[in-house]
């Protein structure tokens, strides 16, 4: 069983991984715009100048966090669904994977749900490809379900993928903003049931 630290993103021991983890924590605590490179360096246990050996600055850190997290997330999701034949079960796994990934790392959830979305430049220039890749994974699950006759064929797979993302995104945001420390991954079955009600 993974420990709490192993379950978090960027939990490696290399300087680069430590800097990325520190950036996640500092951005979540202070906000991206208020965060200082010196704070990130201190949290990572490195000199201020060491940050610039790996990254161009705060924006590069934010972009790298998003891109590497998304790439690792999608790789893990695709591995989990690869050997599952039934589309319904694939969708359940995708829902659980989304809520577990962010539900075990509140700082990463804050960065993903809040800090990354403050910048119109970031949203327009850097996030489109990664979001498209995510939606494609979900879309393929829906198409698979339609092809096997499990899911309704009178709904557009891309529209369904966007709706599923919207539901999961709001679940994470609500959990992140809540005063109650509840089990977000524990809600995955109910959320999957709700989504599947519209597809079966």
Language model features by range: what are they?
Residues 1-4, 21, 93-104, 136, ...:
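C-terminal peripheral helix-coil segments that are non-catalytic and often amphipathic
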Residues 1-30, 34-43, 60:
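Basic, helix-initiating cap at the start of DNA-binding domains
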Residues 7, 65-92, 123, 143:
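Amphipathic alpha-helical linker/stalk segments
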Residues 15, 58, 65, 69-73, ...:
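Hydrophobic/aromatic residues within well-ordered alpha-helical segments
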Residues 45-55:
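Short hydrophobic/aromatic patch on the recognition helix
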Residues 71-75, 122-148, 158-162, 170, ...:
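Amphipathic alpha-helical packing segments from all-alpha helical-bundle domains
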Residues 103-122, 174-177:
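Amphipathic alpha-helical segments used for helix-helix packing
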């Amino acid at each position: 069983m993974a420990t709490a630290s192993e379950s978090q993103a960027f939990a490696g021991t290399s300087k680069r991984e430590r800097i990325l983890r520190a950036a996640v924590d500092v951005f979540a605590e202070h906000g991206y715009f208020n965060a200082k490179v010196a704070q990130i360096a201190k949290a990572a246990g490195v000199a201020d100048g060491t940050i610039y050996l790996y990254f161009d600055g705060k924006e590069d850190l934010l972009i790298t966090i998003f891109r590497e997290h998304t790439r690792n997330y999608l790789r893990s999701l695709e591995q989990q669904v690869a050997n599952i034949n039934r589309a319904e079960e694939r969708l359940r796994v995708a829902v659980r994977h989304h809520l577990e990934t962010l539900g075990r790392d509140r700082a990463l959830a804050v960065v993903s749900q809040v800090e990354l979305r403050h910048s119109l430049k970031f949203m327009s220039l850097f996030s489109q490809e990664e979001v498209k890749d995510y939606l494609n994974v979900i879309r393929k699950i829906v198409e698979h379900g339609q092809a096997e006759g499990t899911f309704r064929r009178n709904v557009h797979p891309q529209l369904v993928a966007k709706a599923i993302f919207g539901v999961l995104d709001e679940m994470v945001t609500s959990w992140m903003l809540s005063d109650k420390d509840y089990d977000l991954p524990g809600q995955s079955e109910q959320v999957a049931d709700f989504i599947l009600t519209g597809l079966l």
